[in-house]
Swiss-Prot record:
Domain remarks in the Swiss-Prot or TrEMBL record: The presence of a 'disulfide through disulfide knot' structurally defines this protein as a knottin.
Chief place of localization: secreted
Protein name: U1-lycotoxin-Ls1b
Location(s), subcellular: Secreted
Pfam family, one: Toxin_35
Provenance organism: Lycosa singoriensis (Wolf spider)
GO cellular component, one term: extracellular region
Top-level taxonomic group: Eukaryota
Disulphide bridges: C44-C59, C51-C68, C58-C86, C70-C84
Residue stretches spanning the membrane: none
Tissue and organ distribution: Expressed by the venom gland.
Length: 107
């Protein structure tokens, strides 16, 4: 029985060592991915800023990604143009309010 335990311990050690090298490789890949995401996050459009030219480039808020909300603006010349800004849609505001309220009560 003792021999079986020694063999199992040896196998567990070998498996953990070989998987740790694989994990190191995965951690390096994950770090590169996080750095790329951070660069993308820096390039995103903040809340209340104009997103007319890039409607899918809004940043993330606390819980949800901001949505590009557009309105039609009529100039003094009578021209209609579309102006867009990054903001929180009403249903996301409601969800954030409920979550915030829940955190205050249960948190």
């Amino acid at each position: 029985m003792m021999k079986v335990l020694v063999v199992v311990a040896l196998l567990a050690t070998l498996i953990s060592y070989s998987s740790s090298e694989g994990i190191d490789d995965l951690e390096a890949d994950e770090l590169l991915s996080l750095m790329a995401n951070e660069q993308t996050r820096k390039e995103c459009i903040p809340k209340h800023h104009e997103c007319t030219s890039n409607k899918h480039g809004c940043c993330r808020g606390n819980f949800f990604k901001y949505k590009c909300q557009c309105t039609t603006v009529v100039t003094q010349d009578g021209e209609q143009t579309e102006r867009c800004f990054c903001g929180t849609p009403p249903h996301h505001k409601a969800a954030e309010l409920v979550v915030g309220f829940g955190k205050k009560i249960f948190g």
